[in-house]
């Protein structure tokens, strides 16, 4: 597996869990901004050894790079309407953090572990889910939650 394939695997996982949300890669130039719900996948860093384990296969040296890739997942949501009081005023509740924590719970599930085994990867939480909601133009909120994950896999060269 290479970096591109690893990112595609993570993209597949996010579309599996966040059904109905647009999943996009972060740091894309000239990309059209999607309407919420949106999941943004960003690669933070890639670490691998300078001198990987190497073996001879059919007379040729083959190197295996154990690779750790840190990924950031940002979830943007519209929130959920909440009716309060008899006047039926509608408020909007921030659901981004709750949704991200549900994803973090999914990462610990038996289904998820089996999915990772099939893909020959390991995926672990690197941080707690964080509420990163922002006030925009003093008029509206952009509901957002962030989570960092560590994906481990082997590159063959």
Regions found by a protein language model. Give the residues of each.
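Small/polar-rich, solvent-exposed N-terminal microdomains that initiate assembly or binding
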Residues: 1-61
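Sterically constrained small-residue positions within well-ordered secondary structures
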Residues: 32, 62-64, 138-140
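Short acidic, gly/pro-rich beta-turn/loop elements at beta-sheet edges
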Residues: 49-51, 83, 157
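Oligomerization/assembly interface segments of phage tail-like spikes and tubes
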Residues: 63-87, 103, 142-153
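Short, structured beta-strand-loop surface elements
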Residues: 88, 92-93
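Winged helix-turn-helix DNA-binding recognition segment
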Residues: 94-98
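Short amphipathic alpha-helices in soluble, non-transmembrane regions
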Residues: 99-107
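Acidic-leaning, charged glycine-interspersed low-complexity segments
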Residues: 107-157
């Amino acid at each position: 597996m290479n970096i591109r394939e690893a990112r595609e695997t993570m993209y597949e996982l996010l579309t599996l869990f966040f059904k109905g949300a647009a999943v996009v890669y972060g740091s894309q130039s000239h990309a059209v901004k999607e309407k919420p719900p949106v999941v943004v996948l960003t690669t933070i860093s890639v670490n691998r050894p300078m001198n990987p384990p190497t073996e001879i296969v059919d007379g040729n040296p083959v190197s295996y790079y154990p690779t750790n890739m840190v990924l950031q997942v940002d979830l943007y949501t519209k929130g959920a309407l909440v009716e309060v009081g008899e006047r039926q005023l509608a408020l909007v509740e921030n659901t981004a953090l709750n949704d991200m924590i549900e994803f973090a719970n999914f990462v610990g599930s038996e289904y998820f572990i089996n999915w990772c085994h099939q893909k020959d990867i390991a995926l672990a939480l690197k941080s707690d889910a964080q509420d990163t909601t922002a006030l925009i133009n003093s008029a509206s909120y952009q509901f957002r939650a962030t989570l960092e994950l560590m994906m481990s896999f082997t590159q063959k060269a």
